[in-house]
Amino acid sequence: MESCWLTMESYQAALVVCIVSGLILAVAGYGNVRRLACEFLLKPPKRFRDDICEALLRGPENDQKPVLVDFGWRHGAVRRQMLLASAKASAYSNERHGSKIHISPDDIARGRSFADALDVHRRSGRILFGFFHPFCNAGGGGEKVLWKAVETTLKQSLNNIVVVYTGDCDTTGARILSNVEHRFGSQLDSERIVFIFLRHRKWVESRTWPRMTLLGQALGSIVLSIEAALCCPPDVWCDTMGYPFGYPFVSWLCRIPIITYTHYPVVSIDMLDKLRMMPEFRNSPTLWAKFLYWRIFMRCYTFAGSFVDLAVTNSTWTYNHINAIWSRTGNVSIIYPPCSTENLVIENAHDMWDRKHQAVVIAQFRPEKRHALILRSFSNFVKKTGSNMKLLMLGSTRGQEDRDYVKKLEQLAYSELAIPKESLEFITDCKYEKMKKYLQESSFGINAMWNEHFGIAVVEYAASGLITLAHASAGPLLDIIVPWDIEGDKQLERGSDKNRTGFFFKDRSDPDFCKITAEFPTLEELFVRADQLTDEERLAISQRAKRCVLHKFSDLKFSEDWAQVVDRTIQLLHTLRNDKVE
């Protein structure tokens, strides 16, 4: 017991010392501490060139053994300087040797010219764009945004170098780039891409934080951001995955522009409203505690956003939320994600609707995609009208939980709702080419998720010429299935049957459903209306939808818009550097 008290007293004393010291530093020495931290991160040791020259003169012991230099905690600043000076920046990844730096054989051959280029007082003109994306090898829509942004950044100038911070330590940079080329068709200059592998990615994984997940991942992202900055401090910080709580630390330590591409807010006003609208909210201490937790978290989220220089969002819905939460930023814009619509759009060879009488649902098998709502609506529609329409449900399954969810849907459809098996088919983990075939031969595409921030499946429906039946919220409503003038090739403010690109529905199960203000039909009613469309009406809607998504969501459009972000970022960087000099 005595030792326990001694431990507690020691802990309290240490805590007091830390708090007092922190206050003193905050009042008297914050600027100096920040300056010293920046110098530690961004400036190599004074004699680092001498050490590298010695290693160059010493050369490799044999052809198989690489020339390594070790600068301990200062390795990040030295690595940065070496890749800025190198003829092949990609050689300075930490993939194989961790904190030790492998001198490229090409730079060894350059000898003195390489050593001269290491001078910290020389401006190489190169700019390091650090893309923070810990799951860069995942192969999803977020990764497509990352790699198309990387491709555009590199094409914008030969002086642009990309540093990709990833936690995919189970693979190599070469394999990642091979996967990117195979999945997305991106043409990348691999010699100007440097992979920095982060060893602490587990701290941002949800399984690490079974409780207080938001808070845990926020703290984990701070650790991961600091690790990235220590391993190789960039000139520009580009977060393309959505880890905002590291921004203050990156800004304080590196004093560099921070650029974000936000797919959806970490916490939103909708989340708070959804909680407050629950019937049991007023009498539930648990829900009150959760509400308070989210409110505090949103305040922290707002604070983190104040360090952002340019915020890019993927949709109007996300823009509205980010613009409200990060109102201090002042530079929030929309760049729609690259959806490769130019590869999906096929022009009709004749004026006939020759597609199968079937509807397709493309959505991951998760409850929030509301497959059950679609099944019930489809069942009622078929029973009331006797229609022979077929429904296909396609989606990926991430694990056993998702596979169990599919079994529950099959039980609901075939047993409870008695939908004939010839009228409904579940297709899990469908290959992309097979999915494209279903899209090209079907007539209707359905999306039932409430407040889907964007909705890439809806873009694929429209690009493939399907008649879209989507929930009237967020991305599908505000950005994708919008009134379109096919002659002027532009979006219109008001919709009518003459400029329609699809249909919308609402449902009583919507968290924000209000019977009095409901202006949209139910999905069941929409099935009936869509089923009664003439071939001429279907062709007109299909053609307008294809033109709309080809104009707004092509890879080319994304590249043009991202190139402007790169230009603005370089201007910001030059302004910041000039301010430092003054």
Curated annotation (Swiss-Prot):
It is a single-pass membrane protein. Keywords: Endoplasmic reticulum, Glycosyltransferase, Membrane, Transferase, Transmembrane, Transmembrane helix. Gene3D superfamilies: Glycogen Phosphorylase B. One of its GO terms (cellular component) is endoplasmic reticulum membrane. The chain crosses the membrane at residues 13-33. It catalyses: an alpha-D-Man-(1->3)-[alpha-D-Man-(1->6)]-beta-D-Man-(1->4)-beta-D-GlcNAc-(1->4)-alpha-D-GlcNAc-diphospho-di-trans,poly-cis-dolichol + 2 GDP-alpha-D-mannose = an alpha-D-Man-(1->2)-alpha-D-Man-(1->2)-alpha-D-Man-(1->3)-[alpha-D-Man-(1->6)]-beta-D-Man-(1->4)-beta-D-GlcNAc-(1->4)-alpha-D-GlcNAc-diphospho-di-trans,poly-cis-dolichol + 2 GDP + 2 H(+). Pfam families: ALG11_N, Glycos_transf_1. Its main location: endoplasmic reticulum. It is found in: Endoplasmic reticulum membrane. Residues 34-240, 262-461, 483-582 are cytoplasmic. GO terms for molecular function: GDP-Man:Man3GlcNAc2-PP-Dol alpha-1,2-mannosyltransferase activity. Its EC number is 2.4.1.131. Belongs to the glycosyltransferase group 1 family. This is GDP-Man:Man(3)GlcNAc(2)-PP-Dol alpha-1,2-mannosyltransferase. It comes from Eremothecium gossypii (strain ATCC 10895 / CBS 109.51 / FGSC 9923 / NRRL Y-1056) (Yeast). The lineage of its organism: Eukaryota, Fungi, Dikarya, Ascomycota, Saccharomycotina.
